[in-house]
Amino acid sequence: MKRFDQVVVVTLNPTIDRVLEVSDFRAGGHQRCVRRDRYPAGKGINVVRAMASLGQTATLTGFVGEAESEWYQQFLLGEGIEDCRLISVPGFTRENITVVDPNAPGSDTHLMEQGFTVMADELAQLRDSLGPLASAGNLVSFCGSLPPGVSAEQFAELIRLCLDSGAEVAVDTSGDSLRASARLPLWLVKPNRQELAELSGHTSQTDELLLSSASLLAEQIRWVLLSLGGEGAVLVDSRIARRAVLPLRTEEVVSTVGCGDILFGGFLAGWQGAEWKEGDLQEVPDPASEALRRGVAAATFAATQLTPTIALARVQALEPDVEISNTDLPDASRPNE
């Protein structure tokens, strides 16, 4: 294993996030915002922003509403994302509104819009642009939900196009698009606890069952990066499960919006920045574990911020405190019921 020649991030359904800080928020009546932020977001956007903040480059493609296209491009350029190839489509980029109450950690309120619809010719344009980007040695990462006009089967077809072109593919999505993509020979999939339980068909979410389900996925997917929120993350391959955790006190958590995306972006940045050597991944330090360490440190720092932003020096300062342990995998062929 080695770093990729190029990381390409595909965001099909980006957002504009508005974060409102309202002390003692309650539904009904009139309340004053203490702080307001507005910025491009969505899984793919958060991933490339995290990578740029941690010193690694990525190419961004996908769709954006034409009304926000120029603002998106300028904002991302200011974040150090120079290779932005988003395709403008008629309509508006959806907005997500998050209300954060600083006096009630963990009680964020989320309001989510539906955005533009992707037409057949626009999807064909994206398909044509992905071909040259999906060459051998590159990683194409599909991040986020599907917009109206793109089905789960069409999503899987985009993935197959990249695989057939020689690229490795990573996926961070949910629902039907996750189920469609999990059947393919991916390089990585990044579910959270609930998504993995739904994917495996189990209602229980015990650690033992989650690891069993992840190891079953790892029979055909190279890496399963399982996000566990405040309990850290687990990186599962065909041999071992690496668990990483960096606990936060409840009062330190400001907002968890986008932290799973930061975990993934931090992991990719750590992977690209690792000191790869000849031989297998059991060499010390283990590059996969170090990539996981960076991802968890980045996500933990992001949880202490109102918006999902990170600073390299602060993340590096947290990394020594990330605890990583290897876990024996249960028998993937006999998951517990």
PLM regions and their residue ranges:
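Conserved phosphate-binding/catalytic region of the ribokinase-like
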Residues: 179, 207-337
